[in-house]
Amino acid sequence: MAKVELTAQALEQFARLPRTIQERVRKVLHRLEQWPNVSGVKALSGSLAGWYRIRTGHYRIRFYVQGDLIVVDQIGHRRDFYEG
């Protein structure tokens, strides 16, 4: 079972989400604790090789894995997620 941690940036982004979306994100983060047996995870490529993303509705969660630690560094709406 993996441990999920959020960076300061991800915590700020999470706090700005609507409450209903926060609950959905919490459920996804709880699912990530079952790494690597998590469905819906996509490995990113290019300059983000080694990173992963999982979606919940129109929102995306980006993270990387270090052993048994999953570090979430970005949470946001898909329209903003892939911008620089």
For each feature predicted by the language model, list its residue ranges.
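Residues forming the ATP-binding cleft of Hanks-type serine/threonine protein kinase domains
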Residues: 76
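Basic, Lys/Arg-enriched alpha-helical interface segments
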Residues: 1-58, 65-73, 81-84
